[in-house]
């Protein structure tokens, strides 16, 4: 990533790229953040024919060998996503892997799936111990690693989520 890129610019690149990608696929796209600075729940909404989608865009930096980490901060109640309703099938996360100022990969995933996997990964992580045998400290940090690494549940998500990789058609189902 070029020097000077910060998490805000990586996030903005992802958001703009999703807007452009959807517009090119004949979706009408609106940005909640254009009216509400850094909207708390959704970033974008998209409409195509009779289909509507509420989108939470999450960008992450891609490093050497496409290493990338999807990171969230859980709320005090343990939830990652505000206003997540299991009955709402219109709620999606679009993950954007950014390298050198451009999105190189997208994952289009129902928000409930991302929430479930982040919680499960965090639970499994805390069942293990640190190298010195002591318990791992419980924090609000949640992470999934895209790259393969050892045999940890929280690694290898590019492979595990392959069916969501650049699969924009999921928004139309």
Regions found by a protein language model. Give the residues of each.
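Mixed-charge (Asp/Glu-Lys/Arg
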Residues: 1-40, 45-173
